[in-house]
Amino acid sequence: MASQVLVYPPYVYQTQSSAFCSVKKLKVEPSGCVFQERACPQIHVNGRHFGNPLPSTKGSAFQTKIPFSKPRGHSFSLQAGAIVVKDTAGATKVIAAQAQQAGVEAPRAVVWRNRLHFLGGPQRCGLKRKSEELDNHSGAMQIVDELSILPAMLQTNMGNPVTVVTATTGSKQNCTSGEGDYQLVQHEVLCSVKNTYEVLDFLGRGTFGQVVKCWKRGTNEIVAIKILKNHPSYARQGQIEVSILARLSTENADEYNFVRAYECFQHRNHTCLVFEMLEQNLYDFLKQNKFSPLPLKVIRPVLQQVATALKKLKSLGLIHADLKPENIMLVDPVRQPYRVKVIDFGSASHVSKTVCSTYLQSRYYRAPEIILGLPFCEAIDMWSLGCVIAELFLGWPLYPGALEYDQIRYISQTQGLPGEQLLNVGTKSTRFFCRETDMSHSGWRLKTLEEHEAETGMKSKEARKYIFNSLDDIVHVNTVMDLEGSDLLAEKADRREFVSLLKKMLLIDADLRITPIETLNHPFVSMKHLLDFPHSSHVKSCFHIMDICKSPSSCETNNHSKMSLLRPVASNGTAALAANFTKVGTLRSQALTTSAHSVVHHGIPLQAGTAQFGCGDAFHQTLIICPPAIQGIPAAHGKPTSYSIRVDNTVPLVTQAPAVQPLQIRPGVLSQTWSGRTQQMLIPAWQQVTPMAPAAATLTSEGMAGSQRLGDWGKMIPHSNHYNSVMPPPLLTNQITLSAPQPISVGIAHVVWPQPATTKKNKLCQNRSNSLQNTNVPHSAFISPKIISGKEVEEVSCVETQDNHTSEGEARTCHEASVRQDSSVSDKQRQTIIIADSPSPAVSVITISSDTDDEETSPRPSLRECKGSLDCEACQSTLNIDRMCSLSSPDSTLSTSSSGQSSPSPCKRPNSMSDDEQESGCETVDGSPTSDSSGHDSPFAESSFVEDTPQNPELGTCAGTEAKPALSTAVEPPVGTERGLNVDAHMANTDSTCQPLTKGQPAPGKLNQPSASAARQQKPTSAFQQQHLNLSQVQHFGTGHQEWNGNFGHRRQQAYIPTSVTSNPFTLSHGSPNHTAVHAHLAGSAHLGGQPTLLPYPPSTALSSAAPVAHLLASPCTSRPMLQHPTYNISHPSGIVHQVPVGINPRLLPSPTIHQTQYKPIFPPHSYIAASPAYTGFPLSPTKLSQYPYM
C-alpha cells in the first residue's frame, strides 16, 4: 500500500545521533492507495489526448509538477508516483538529463542510508512487483536535502524545491553497509582515471546497488552512475555486466536502442558504471497516467525499438533477462516522444552460459521456461516484451502474479497448460503441477489453490484486473469510441494484428515463439495492413509516430563513427562541418555548412522523367556536387585528385513517363578539380520509396495510397552499399563550363519543414506545441536560425548554444548582418518581439529590422493573427502542414518552422491536435503558458514591407478563413546590387492568392488555386489556369501571413524584376502529362512522390551587369567577403540557356522577403552565367531534360 510523506516543521524532528551520522527522523503516515480509483480513461502525451479523452486543460503526462502552495516547513502531501524509489533489481529510475550549474549546488551534505525506501516500497495499489519481501520499516529514512521532486528538465515552473530533511556527515561517511551498499554523500566526488564526477542526486536502488545522478566536472554533461555492491554474491554478476557493456560499447547504442555506457571504474572497492542520462522509465510514465491504457499507435514505436535492441542482442548471443517497463527508458519524452532505450544489463548473460533453474526476470514478465526450470535462450526476452506491450495496452500487467504459482496459474488459465513434453523436462514442474494417476494415460494438471497453500504455506491472491479465457479476448478491451468511418476500420484492423503478434510472442513453447526479426517484419510493426486505409487521419498519425523511432537511427548512425564520409573535419580554410539528413516526411534534404570561402551546393536534382502528377519515376536521385572539404572528407594525398561515383537506387518506382534520351555532360566537368588536393564527389541527398501505384493527375495531399510507406520517404543510402561503381561522364545535357580552380554555383532550393526535432546533443529549437509528430532526424548540420536580431552592425556574429548544453529551450541563433549597409537601410525601424511561450526559462527578445523607412505608428492588422477558422492551415496538424521552399539567395539560410506551432502565439483551437483525435479542449503545450495571437507577437515588424507603397489593412487577414491552397511556392533569384531594381513583395492572401506589390506598378494578375479541402477529396480538377507571365511581374503563391512564424531566419529577398525590361511572354513546354500551367513549380500536393521538379530558366536576353544570376547559398554565421570569381555558364548545346534544375518538395511555401540592399551577394555582379535578369516563367517538364536510368 502506498503512503503519504508528510514534512513537518523543524521542531517536530527528533534528532538521533550515532557513530556514523546524525539523522533527523521523518514522520511517515500511511494512507490509502493514491491510485486506487482509475481516473477517466485518458492519456496526456505532450498536450495531446489519446484513448477516450475528456475536455481538460491540465498538464501533460510528462509533467510531474506538484504544486506547492504552502511555504517550506508546512505540511503537504506528495503523490506516490513522484518520489517512489523502487528496491528491485534493475530499478534504475533515471529521471532527468539537465545540466546542473555549480552555483545551484546545495551547500549541505546528505547521507543516503542503505535502506532508503519511500512510500512503502515498490507497490502498485497493494501489489508488489517483486516476490522478495522488502523491509520497509526498519532503518532511518532520509531524503536528499534540497532534492527536487521533479525531473530537472521539467522544473521550469518550480521556484522552490522542497527541503525535506537534513543530515550532517559523520566521521565515517563513506563506509560500506553490511549489505555491500556504498554510503553516499551528496556532492561527493567519484574519480575515474580520466574524469571526476560529482554526486548530485540519488536516483534509485535495487538488488545490484544504487544509481546516482552525477555531474561530469569540467563539462555540462550529466551522467547516471551505477554503483554496484561490493558483496561477494554480486561480484561475479558485476563482472559479467561489465564485460557485456564493454561488448555493447562497440555498437551504435542509438541505432540499436540500448543505453550508452561511457566507462567503468573502481571507487573504494565499488564498481562504478557510467551511463548516459535518460529521462523516465515506462512504469513511471504509466503511473503518471494513472495506469491508463496506451493507444496502439504509441505502443508500436516502443515495440519496434525494443525489438530492434533484442535483435541486436540475439545476434551477439546475449540475453537481457530482465526486460520490464522499469528497464525501458523514455529518452526525452518532451523533445523525442516515443524514443526509448533498453537499460540494465545486470542480469544479462551469454546464451552459451545459461544455467537451468536460474532465478531470472521479474516475476510479472517471467517466461514459462524460467518458471518451470527449462533450458532457455533469448526467447525469454520476447516473452517479457510481449508482457510489456500487453501491459501498455491494458494499463495493467497481463499476468501480475504475487507468487510463481500465481504466475503460471494465470498463464495456464488464459493460454492453456504447458505441453506435456515441457512439463516432463522441467526441473520445477512438480512445484506447480501434479501428475494424474487415475486416468488411462498419465497427464499433468495444475495444483489447486488449497494444495499449493498446504505445501508451501503461502496463500495465493488474485491480482488480475482482466481475466481472459483466451488472448483473443484482449481485442475487446478498451475499445476506442471516438472513431468512425475509415479511422474505426483501421483501428479494428490494427487491434487484430496486435493480438496476432501478441499471441506469437506469448507462445509457451519457446521454440515456436516469434523472434525479434520476425517481430519487426510483422504487419503490426510494418503497418502493411494500414495501407488499406490511405485516407484515414488515424493511419497518417500512426505513420508519423513511427517515423519518430525510425529517424534517429539512420541519422545517428552517421554521427557516431559509422560513416566516416560524413564526419566533420577541420582545416585552415573550412570550419568543422557536419552533415544532416533531415527527415521531412517525403523528402530528406541535406544541409551543409562551410566557411565564407566555400560555396555550398545543396544539390542538383536530376529528374528521371516527365511524369509529375501521381506517378513516381523509376530512378530518381538528388546528387550533390561539391569538393570533399564540404562533405567532411579529408584530402587523400597520393591518390587521384578526382573520381566519379555511380549511385544506384535500390528501390525503383513505377513510372508512366515515356522513356527519353539521357542527358549529356562534357567529360571535363567531373574530372576538373577545385584545388590540387581535393576530390569531387556525387553524393545522394535521399533515396526513393517503395513501389507505389500511380494516381494520375490527382491534385491531392492524400495521394499516399498504394503500398508505399510514409516512413520510408527520405531514407538515406548507406554509403558502403551503394558507392560501388563508376559513373560515366555523361550526366547532364546542359554543358557546364567551369574555370578549373573554382566551385560550381548553381540554382539550389531550400526545403523547409515546419517541425524541427531536437535532441540533447544539438539542442535544436523545438516546436513544442507539436512535438508528438516530430519526424526530423535529431542530428543537424547547422542549426536553423530563429528570427534574426537585426542589429546595425557590419560584422557577422554567430551565437550558438553548445551541443551538450542542457537548457531545454535553448536554440542556436545566428545573427547575420550585411558587410556593407546602406544608410537608408540602417535607419529602418526595429521592433522587439517577446515570445510568450518560449521553452527557454528566460524571455526571448528578438529584434528585427523592418524593410521600410517610414515609421508607422498606427496599428495595422497583424499578419500572423489567426482567426480560428476551421480551414486555418496553421491550426491544423502537421499532417497537413505545408512544406516551405524558396530558392536560396546568398543570404538565405535553411530555416525550419511550423505555422501555428513554433510561432510565438500558437492558435488555441480544440482541433489543434493530431488528425485522428477529437476535440478535447486540451490546449496545454508542454507546460508552456498560453498566449494569444496578437500583433506584438508577430515575427515581422509592424511596418510595411514595401517602401513607398500604400498598405491595405484588409491584406492582414488570415488566409485560413478562405479555402486553403494546394501549395505555395516562390522562386527567388539571388541578391542584386542595384537599389533601383528593388522590389519588395508584400504577401497577402485574402482570396487564396498573393499579389506581389511591385514598386510603382500594380500586380497585373492573380493565380487561382484550388482549396486544400477539394484537393483532399482527390477531385481531378485543374489546379491552375494557364496564363502568360510577363517580365515585369513576379507571381507568388502563399497561404497568408499566418504561415510566417518565429523560426524563420533572415527574410529572403523576393524576386525582383527591372521594369525597364520588355515583356516576353512564355508558354509552358509540352513534355509531361497534365501540363496545365503552373507558374514557378508544380502544384505541390499533386507532386506526390516529392520528386524534384526541373526548373530551368527560359531563354532570354543578355545578362546585365547587376542582374541576378544564380542562387548561391552562403553558410550562416560566417563572414561574406566579396569573392572574385571567374565566369562560367550553364548552356545548352543548341544555344538555349537554362539554369540547372532545382528540386522542389510537395506543398511548398515561399520564404519571407528581405530588403535586397541589406546584404551583398557573395560574388561581384559581373556576368558569369548566361541567364537573363528577368525571369518570365518556368516549364514544368522541359523537353531538353531527360530521364537518367543510371540514377
UniProtKB/Swiss-Prot annotation:
Catalytic reaction(s) noted: L-seryl-[protein] + ATP = O-phospho-L-seryl-[protein] + ADP + H(+); L-threonyl-[protein] + ATP = O-phospho-L-threonyl-[protein] + ADP + H(+)
Q: Name one GO molecular function term.
A: protein tyrosine kinase activity
Compositional bias, Polar residues, is annotated for 1008-1022
Region (Interaction with FAS) residue ranges read 774-867
**Which residue stretches belong to region Interaction with UBL1?**
846-856
Renumbered residue ranges of the record's region Interaction with AR: 766-920
**Family statement drawn from the similarity comment of this UniProt entry:** Belongs to the protein kinase superfamily. CMGC Ser/Thr protein kinase family. HIPK subfamily.
Q: What is this protein called?
A: Homeodomain-interacting protein kinase 3
Organism this protein belongs to: Rattus norvegicus (Rat)
Q: Which gene encodes it?
A: Hipk3
